[in-house]
């Protein structure tokens, strides 16, 4: 049975990867699951310098989802290379690094810095809706997406993935801009912009006011957007948004995603990724499917 897929130059042993953010740098989850079983690990978003992130509260539960306002807390690109990468290199799993810059130059700087052994791919975060400057502004403008993608593509030999925001009028235009800029793949969706209010204080729950909604609540939005993007680009698409089990994952594969990423589910169930891999295998066995590629894009309209 073949579960392997290719995203740019990266060969994944199966199509299940971690979404940036909820999996940290893999250390905590390595105590629960065998990281070698994953298709790839996408690490928490990195910035040029360390960031402390937003003041608490940072997470707020909503109906069928979570709002987060983390603010890209991370140790910075240098500390990642020094402290986290050696740990990740000890596993037989491709490592993809998510980068978040406040300027085009910062994206390029990080891409150059991460063009090293042990890293297979760069995921450009043009879509994080948490930070007051940077991500959001880039991700809603197709010209900016094209510009960043083109410059990062020139700066690295690694597979370049562009992660799109759903908070746009037409995500297809953004996807085409990323492809035109030289992206090897597109990942979507990032969180959906949302907010919550404390009715006793009559204030927003988050100091930043707006947070990012993830979890099962956004799955139908994500699925629709992945379906739309697959029809307009010829590069691989990584689908994510509310995937909680193997059935959710299969929906994304059937509409045409080459791989899927698991985010919020990792918080709920640390075994989630490997359970999804096992579920896909079982589905293939029961339906006498020998190759995962028979499922990808098999939707009948």
From Swiss-Prot:
What does this protein need as cofactor?
FMN
Q: Where is the active site?
A: 128
Keyword Cytoplasm carried by entry: yes
PROSITE patterns of this UniProt entry? DHODEHASE_1, DHODEHASE_2
Q: Which UniProt keywords apply?
A: Cytoplasm, Flavoprotein, FMN, NAD, Oxidoreductase, Pyrimidine biosynthesis
Which reactions appear under catalytic activity for this entry?
A: (S)-dihydroorotate + NAD(+) = orotate + NADH + H(+)
This protein's GO CC annotations? cytoplasm
Q: How does it assemble?
A: Heterotetramer of 2 PyrK and 2 PyrD type B subunits.
The protein's name is Dihydroorotate dehydrogenase B (NAD(+)), catalytic subunit
């Amino acid at each position: 049975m073949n579960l392997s897929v290719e995203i740019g130059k990266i060969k994944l042993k199966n199509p299940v990867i971690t979404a940036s953010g909820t999996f940290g740098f893999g250390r905590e989850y390595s105590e629960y699951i065998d990281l070698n079983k994953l298709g790839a690990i996408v690490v928490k978003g990195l910035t040029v310098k360390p960031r402390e992130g937003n003041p608490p509260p940072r997470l707020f539960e909503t109906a069928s989802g979570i709002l987060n306002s983390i603010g890209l807390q991370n140790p910075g690109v240098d500390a990642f290379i020094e402290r986290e990468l050696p740990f990740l290199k000890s596993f037989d799993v491709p490592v993809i690094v998510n980068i978040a810059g406040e300027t085009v130059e910062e994206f390029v700087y990080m891409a150059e810095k991460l063009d090293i052994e042990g890293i297979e791919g760069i995921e450009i975060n043009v879509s994080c809706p948490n930070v007051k400057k940077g991500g959001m502004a880039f991700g809603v403008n197709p010209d900016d997406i094209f510009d960043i993608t083109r410059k990062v593509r020139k700066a690295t030999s690694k597979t370049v993935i562009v992660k799109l925001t759903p908070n746009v009028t037409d995500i297809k235009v953004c996807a085409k801009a990323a492809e035109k800029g030289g992206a090897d793949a597109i990942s979507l969706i990032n969180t959906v912009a949302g907010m919550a209010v404390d009715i006793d204080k009559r204030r927003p729950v988050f100091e930043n006011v707006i947070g990012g909604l993830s979890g099962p609540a956004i799955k139908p939005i994500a699925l629709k957007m992945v379906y739309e993007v697959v029809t307009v680009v010829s590069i691989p698409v990584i689908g994510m948004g509310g995937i909680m089990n193997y059935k959710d994952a299969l929906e994304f594969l059937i509409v045409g995603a080459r791989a899927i990423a698991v985010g919020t589910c990792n918080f709920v169930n640390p075994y989630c990724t490997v359970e999804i891999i096992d579920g896909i295998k079982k589905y293939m066995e029961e339906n006498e499917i020998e190759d995962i590629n028979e499922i990808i894009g098999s939707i009948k309209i």
